[in-house]
Amino acid sequence: MKTTFDTVADALTVLRQGGVIILADDESRENEGDLVALAQDITPETVHMMLREAAGLMCTPVGPGIAERLGFTEMVAESTDPHQTPFTYTVDGTFEATGVTTGVSAMDRAATIRQIANPTATRADFNAPGHTQPLTAKEGGLATRIGHTEAAVDLAQIGRASCRERV
């Protein structure tokens, strides 16, 4: 069976328009696809669709600068994960900063994710533990680690053009 993939330029166009792409990795790695959208554009409807259709763990990849600014630290000191997925602890937006109540609804998760993308957000805007799972991309992105986390962050950085720092 022949597999066809879109170009990076096509993916960037979809992301810039607030859409969702499937980011696939190599058959020799995890051989899976992740649904990716830009955090600043995420809606409750998009979160709901991602949870319904992908039925897996929903994560929010961030660049190392954002992780540092928001105080997102590694979940474990030494990961035994063969792919070294860079999990941090989970968070919810605070009610004061985001209006989040329980954190579990699609509305609350979207608000938390948008706050993570907010360039004025601080650590005080989040409660932990929560229902949103940040992942911290390695410094240098795909040039440093070949993973969905780095690919998603690199696409977001390229896609933002000359806009402010975003996830």
Describe each region flagged by the PLM.
Residues 1-164:
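Catalytic domains of riboflavin
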